[in-house]
Each structure stands twice: as structure tokens, then as C-alpha cells.
């Protein structure tokens, strides 16, 4: 499982012109589910999304987590993060989970974070979305929770 996380002052996602998810200060996470991902990756990624220390403390050091700040979490599915870009000029999406598995595990990640934190907002799985954000810093990190078995394995 891959998550590209960004510290934001605000973020929202629209589908067909309607806002389906929005947060104020917090974390926008673009999430890709990979082949071989399962409950282990869901649990670990939920823990990392809520616990990753990327917010400033009183001395302006990145010492506080999303859970500690009470900020919002906006989860947006983005299978393209799982692309293999090593060869040629066109990405291969072989490492990405199939849509059914991707939806099931993305929904499980949403549930896992919502049980531990509020507010949590989401985009719409599989939809053509427009994501709007104001990146704070900018601060952006790539989090990985490797699959139990290698993609394609």
C-alpha cells in the first residue's frame, strides 16, 4: 500500500462538480492499493496516517501527528501511484490491485481511520475526481507498507 501524504491548510475533492469530501487543516492522502495487500497493510497504513509526525510543535519542529493536532484526514484513492514506471514512456499498472480488491481494502482503510480519528473525509472510489488542496510548507511524504507478497508474485 502506498500513500502520498501532504500537510494541508485545506483540501477537497469533487465528483461531477459536487464536493464529496473536504477538510480544513490536516492531511490529504492519495492512496494506492497494491497486489498482495491485505489486512496487515490496512492496519499499518492507518497507524502511520494518524501517527506520522509532520506537524510543527511549539518550537516549529515536525513533532506532532495528525491525531495529536486533531486535524482532518482526506483519503483519496489513486491507483496510478502503484504504477511501474521503470521502463519506456508508458506506465504499467500491473502492480496495482484489481478494482474489487482495491475498493474493499480502501474501504477498510477508511473504516480503520474513522474508528480512531475524526474528521475523516473521502473521495469516491473509481470516480473521475478533481482534488483541490493548499499544501502547507510544502510538506509531502511517500509512505509505503509493502505487500505480503511481491506484486505479480
From Swiss-Prot:
Q: Name one GO molecular function term.
A: Gly-tRNA(Ala) deacylase activity
Return the SUPFAM superfamilies for the record: DTD-like (SSF69500)
Major location category of this protein: cytoplasm
Q: Where is this motif: Gly-cisPro motif, important for rejection of L-amino acids?
A: 137-138
Protein name, entry field: D-aminoacyl-tRNA deacylase
What EC number(s) would the UniProt record show?
3.1.1.96
GO biological process: any one? D-amino acid catabolic process
NCBIfam families named among the record's database cross-references: D-aminoacyl-tRNA deacylase (TIGR00256)
A GO cellular component annotated for this chain's UniProt record is: cytoplasm
Q: Which PANTHER family match?
A: D-AMINOACYL-TRNA DEACYLASE 1 (PTHR10472:SF5), D-TYROSYL-TRNA TYR DEACYLASE (PTHR10472)
Going by the UniProt record, its keywords in alphabetical order are:
Cytoplasm, Hydrolase, RNA-binding, tRNA-binding
Amino acid at each position: 500500500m502506498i500513500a502520498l501524504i501532504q500537510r494541508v491548510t485545506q483540501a477537497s475533492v469533487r465528483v461531477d462538480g459536487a464536493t464529496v469530501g473536504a477538510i480544513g487543516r490536516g492531511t490529504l492522502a492519495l492512496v494506492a492499493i497494491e497486489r498482495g495487500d491485505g489486512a496487515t497493510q490496512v492496519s499499518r497504513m492507518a497507524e502511520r496516517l494518524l501517527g506520522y509526525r509532520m506537524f510543527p510543535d511549539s518550537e516549529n519542529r515536525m513533532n506532532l501527528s495528525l491525531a495529536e493536532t486533531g486535524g482532518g484526514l482526506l483519503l483519496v484513492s489513486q491507483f496510478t501511484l502503484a504504477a511501474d514506471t521503470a521502463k519506456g514512456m508508458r506506465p504499467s499498472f500491473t502492480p496495482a490491485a484489481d478494482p474489487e480488491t482495491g475498493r474493499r481494502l480502501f474501504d477498510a482503510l477508511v473504516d480503520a481511520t474513522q474508528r480512531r480519528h475524526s474528521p475523516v473525509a473521502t473521495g469516491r472510489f473509481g470516480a473521475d475526481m478533481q482534488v483541490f488542496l493548499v499544501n502547507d510548507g510544502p510538506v509531502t511524504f511517500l509512505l509505503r507498507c509493502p505487500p505480503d507478497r511481491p506484486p505479480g508474485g
